[in-house]
Regions:
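Amphipathic, Lys/Arg-enriched alpha-helical "gate/interface" segment within cytosolic domains
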Residues: 1-132
Length: 132
């Protein structure tokens, strides 16, 4: 499978989606189902890191599938961080946010590296702890 899904930390607050090489819509759909299976037994909110630092161009139709995945996310989803420096992926993300999810610009962000993704989420989690 060109998309691997796993917990990124032992606290089970971050899911890591690792996109490798060329991947297909069917693999994206399977990964989304796997995320739902992982999160069905937890009672807290999660972040998702989409690690696209080592993948090729997204398949045709990904915006529609990403929209479906976003609509299915539910209450447990706190936000997503896309790790990539691929200009095409960044442009598609911008199109997705403008067309399907303009109100969620703060919930979906892009960074260049996995380190930046984890740093951003850690900062967001600290903010949540401070406000509760």
């Amino acid at each position: 499978m060109a998309i691997r899904v796993s917990w990124d930390n032992p606290e089970k607050t971050i899911i890591h989606m690792l996109f490798e090489g060329r991947w297909r819509i069917s693999e994206f759909d399977a990964a989304v189902k796997q995320i739902h299976a992982l999160t069905c037994d937890i009672d807290h909110r999660i972040y998702i890191i989409c690690n696209m630092t080592h993948c090729g161009a997204p398949p045709i139709g990904i915006l529609w599938q990403a929209r479906r995945a976003y609509q299915m996310a539910g209450e447990k989803w706190r936000g997503a961080v896309i790790a990539t420096d691929n200009r095409l992926i960044l442009d598609l993300l911008g199109s997705f946010l403008n067309a399907y999810a303009p109100q969620t610009v703060e919930k979906i962000i892009a960074v260049k590296t996995m380190e930046e993704a984890r740093e951003y989420i850690a900062c967001q989690q600290r903010k949540c702890v401070e406000t509760s």
